[in-house]
């Protein structure tokens, strides 16, 4: 499927080394002020060539809107857009045309479709996620009207991780480091590790934490449309994602109800909770507390080291990849996680609004 969402929907198209990546957004509310500078800023956070710890591929990543906008506002009709690819080095993939990269989508795409575009991974490339960042930026602008804010950050790279919870850090510092970690000391250690891994032609994974504040009570559609299930689905569609947990996640298995339950209390006329182990979601429905979750990313499959593999004829061979690749996806994946979160929350907010007049 190339379409995400129920009411607020994105259909993306394009390949890594094709002419461009684009999309069509349907179901966007009319009248949203389209802050093009903000949208470009979001794309810049994701684009390649940002620092020594990202891919050296250089792209302008400037979005061109084709429809659905008049005098700077959304019209409620489909929003078409495209971002042109300008810096492809397709010859870097000549030695991969008939060879499968270990842990990459090469083999599964070839087997499923009987054909694949080997240049940069084609449709399986994370280059596709730029379309999500456009749709996510517009979703953020819509959510801003409801006081909903989303902030993601790198909380772990390999064995190096932040201690404590998101509440222990000033998340406004996230964008001040190349790795997008809000703690300067830990960020420096992460960047050093990524640079070391890159120098050896290897890659490394990690974890991104995301927090959504200001989400009202009531978003989520039991029983098969639970909000945490929707967020999990959204995250697991992102390239290289291998795990998702919200609230206290797997740690919930180690505690008794008397230890873990989020107790309610009257907070000056408002219902609040003493703790937030549930991660802002109970029974699949938002409860008004901060929604927070973690997303685990594997190391990038394409490494510049010799690997045992097979070719399309099933013959054993050795592959040493070439090209420009991220040694760690985390720095550029932070805005992607935020975008998928924004799209999901706006979608579920619009679903909830269909109930208000009944």
UniProtKB/Swiss-Prot annotation:
This reaction introduces a second double bond into the aromatic ring system. It comes from Parabacteroides distasonis (strain ATCC 8503 / DSM 20701 / CIP 104284 / JCM 5825 / NCTC 11152). Pfam families: Chorismate_synt (PF01264). HAMAP family: Chorismate_synth. This is Chorismate synthase. It is an enzyme of class 4 (lyase). It catalyses: 5-O-(1-carboxyvinyl)-3-phosphoshikimate = chorismate + phosphate. Keywords: Amino-acid biosynthesis, Aromatic amino acid biosynthesis, FAD, Flavoprotein, FMN, Lyase, NADP. One of its GO terms (molecular function) is chorismate synthase activity. CDD domains: Chorismate_synthase. One of its GO terms (cellular component) is cytosol. Belongs to the chorismate synthase family. NADP(+) binds at residues 46, 52. The keyword Oxidoreductase does not apply. SUPFAM superfamilies: Chorismate synthase, AroC. Its cofactor is FMNH2. The keyword Flavoprotein applies.
